[in-house]
């Protein structure tokens, strides 16, 4: 993924400006012109109510990966729901947000957990001025408004809770609200689920639910894309350390893959945070401890992580040598 050089999310920029920036960036990345044309036709055919426009994401990053983009766009244009499966730091949530922005649809982020139940998704009765009133949940609102529902870490919830999504995600495209009416999904509604397979606290998705998604296995970020990300985030970072930090992340990834360290240290956000700390004057050693090393609480593992870091980045490195 790469950063869109401050073109997104500024209050003084109009929606169409950053949306056109996104589409132009996708063209530059070689995404199929036919798919991009179809997305623009989709937006034109499905105008959005003014009240919902603040819900259209204004991403700070754009996901980088032509093949994944083309698969995702084609699936959504065909009316499919997406399941983005992959390890840590593969850009699942970034891509989900980007897709909602590209299609110009309002997004509802739904974070799953072990205590999630049907009422959390669809809605529940509540009191308003002494009267029992139905308070719609995020899935209900998404269905009504033709939004994109981002089902974050869908395999954290119990399968019993997820059963309410079956009719939403298959050909019926409807929600039966107990005690109320049956709600058909708006034509524009799509759901994009994300999951990390095999993490603590996660469960196997049952076959019935999985069959309702088109599944994309998210690839790990490459050295080239890491360097693009670092240059976009830190334009003044020297070429030498752009390369070294990219290799550091890949070294940590290899250690995780071989089970020498846990995935706690494989934290791209943490690396970027550490670089921001270094820019503020914190030396590389303490900054990388805060951003990466200390996220593993075992002292032996911390030692292994520090050894990996020391092979690439001197602990005494300061901002004067790191940035131009």
Predicted regions and their residues:
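C-terminal regulatory/interaction module of P-loop NTP-utilizing enzymes
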Residues: 1-324
């Amino acid at each position: 993924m790469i950063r869109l050089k401050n073109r997104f999310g500024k209050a003084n920029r109009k929606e169409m400006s950053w949306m056109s920036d996104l589409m132009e960036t996708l063209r530059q990345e070689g995404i199929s012109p036919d798919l991009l044309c179809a997305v623009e036709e989709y937006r034109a055919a499905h105008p959005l109510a003014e009240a919902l426009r603040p819900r259209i994401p204004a991403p700070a990053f754009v996901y980088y990966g032509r093949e994944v983009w083309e698969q995702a766009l084609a699936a959504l244009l065909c009316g499919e729901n997406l399941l983005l499966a992959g390890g840590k730091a593969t850009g699942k949530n970034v891509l989900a947000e980007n897709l909602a922005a590209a299609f110009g649809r309002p997004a509802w982020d739904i974070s799953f957990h072990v205590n999630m139940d049907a009422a959390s998704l669809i809605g529940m009765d509540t009191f308003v001025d002494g009267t029992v009133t139905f308070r719609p949940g995020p899935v209900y609102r998404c269905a009504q408004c033709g939004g994109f529902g981002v089902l974050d870490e869908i395999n954290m919830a119990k399968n019993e809770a997820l059963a309410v999504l079956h009719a939403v995600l298959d050909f019926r495209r409807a929600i039966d609200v107990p005690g109320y009416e049956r709600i058909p999904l708006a034509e524009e509604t799509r759901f994009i689920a994300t999951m990390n397979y095999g993490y603590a606290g996660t469960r196997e998705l049952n076959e019935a639910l999985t069959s309702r998604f088109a599944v994309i296995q998210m690839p790990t970020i490459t050295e080239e894309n890491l360097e693009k990300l670092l240059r976009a985030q830190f334009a003044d970072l020297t070429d030498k350390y752009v390369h070294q930090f990219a290799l550091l992340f890949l070294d940590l990834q290899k250690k995780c893959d071989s089970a020498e360290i846990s995935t706690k240290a494989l934290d791209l956000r943490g690396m970027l945070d550490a670089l921001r700390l270094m820019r503020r004057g914190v030396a590389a050693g303490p900054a990388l401890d805060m951003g990466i090393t200390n996220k593993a609480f075992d002292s032996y593992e911390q030692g292994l992580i520090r050894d990996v870091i020391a092979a690439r980045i001197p602990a005494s490195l300061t901002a004067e040598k790191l940035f131009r």
